[in-house]
């Protein structure tokens, strides 16, 4: 077969296969042309779901008579002139093929009048050779484009169109998406002569919120968190719905790049990752987000429908979006309970998460008496992994961040007999240990310490009970371990070793932790006491990896933070560190802080609010790695004996 150049009409119809998928894609292209023309009012009129008629009317700059024919030609555009323009596209359209493609599969009429022109002129594309006829017309300033009988000359394409209702729903969605990105423009949509949508121009912030509520619903605004974060040459703004407004489908996921509506995988992944631990499975977030950045930093010429883009610094953009969204969500949800979980009956007073305690609360806990026990309602049969086997096997129970399975309050006879078999002490066992005098108790504890140190493997962990307590078996009975206290000791040791390793590997004589620059500096408000403390101890905090500057009278801007705390909320972690150091300095009557104080305070900030079985397993492995043969001693020091035998007997 010989090679031949395709006829213009056939070439345009092939191009239309990418540009014109359905009536909604025609409307998208025409509205974007109106926006590029500077229109502030756009009216969309459709009949029969856009299959019979589509008419777009705007008040934009218009097209002069001499360029009407050219406007219907392929690759004819006023938006780019050179390769430099293509690399920094600021308009919504730029390829110059939409009108030519549409006119090749429909009957198109273009009427336009620039303000500088006395009369309006109309261009009609018709015939097999797509000849354009020009004639005068009556029309106000602006442009109207009428598209009749879409796909009339391509029956195969027309056959794939859906019902009138379905096609109009796609049109409605396109108009809604575009209306969200252009508050400065009024939009109206009519279908079969009936007005369906009417969005007035929004010039104030309140009017913008009103439009968002009209598009996404008032409940979205009620549950939304507003964000507006500039950073370098990027700005992310818009609204994020709290996880309580999660959706069963992704019908309220609106993202825009430089005013262009997107379904970009990178953007969606960053947003989904920010919601990752907050949403129940099989649900979707709701958001309206606008990303503004330098046009030279994004390539929009990578997708036929321009729904996807390519960022020159994709990882940087991804992390920026994730950081802003995650920070906004966690800040908004601070103090809120995201999901309902089963209540635990375990009450060890005054134990709480060290991360949630203030300095006064923690100080009070040091002088508290031995806590009383209310035994938990739990399945005593399910064991936790043995600490020595933890690295070789997975957790025996699955943990979900959004809730727990409700546990039965009944203790089966099998469970009771299992625990009865575990309890094999001699006379004067754990019950006696609790009731002995001070000297006898010290002697018993010393004996148990020696026994545990000689046989670490004889400690078997049985189960974990939230918020952070574990039962484990020793030769002398069952003990209740505070995972909070154990974590404080373990993380303090981890920070200490990290400090020493950094000092040994660095040529710098100044001891310092590995510091990690923050992608987005964090602004933190401090009390007068806290501010005076951090300013006075700025040098030692800097050595520990905490770098900040004073921004306002009572605010600091955190720029770098210890890498060990990368998983923690920066603001909360720093408050914990500051309060702990202030408390320690008050105990030492104003003496200079030492390295150990820093180790302990940073370790305290790493303690979680609660521990499930997986997190407890990780903590125990880390404790064993850091303390080696002292593991059993650490377990003993952070636990109390439990007389489970007498408790089980009361159940029968």
Curated annotation (Swiss-Prot):
SUPFAM superfamilies named in the record: ATPase domain of HSP90 chaperone/DNA topoisomerase II/histidine kinase, DNA mismatch repair protein MutL, Ribosomal protein S5 domain 2-like
SMART domains per the UniProt record, alphabetical: DNA_mis_repair, MutL_C
Alphabetized GO MF terms: ATP binding; ATP hydrolysis activity; ATP-dependent DNA damage sensor activity; mismatched DNA binding
Keyword Hydrolase: no
Top-level taxon in the UniProt lineage: Bacteria
GO CC terms of this entry: mismatch repair complex
InterPro entries reported in the protein's UniProt record: DNA_mismatch_repair_CS, DNA_mismatch_repair_MutL, DNA_mismatch_S5_2-like, HATPase_C_sf, MutL/Mlh/PMS, MutL/Mlh/Pms-like, MutL_C, MutL_C_regsub
Pfam families: DNA_mis_repair (PF01119), HATPase_c_3 (PF13589), MutL_C (PF08676)
Region span, Disordered: 357-377, 425-457
Family: Belongs to the DNA mismatch repair MutL/HexB family.
Function: This protein is involved in the repair of mismatches in DNA. It is required for dam-dependent methyl-directed DNA mismatch repair. May act as a 'molecular matchmaker', a protein that promotes the formation of a stable complex between two or more DNA-binding proteins in an ATP-dependent manner without itself being part of a final effector complex.
Protein name listed in UniProt: DNA mismatch repair protein MutL
Classification lineage: Bacteria, Pseudomonadati, Pseudomonadota, Gammaproteobacteria, Alteromonadales
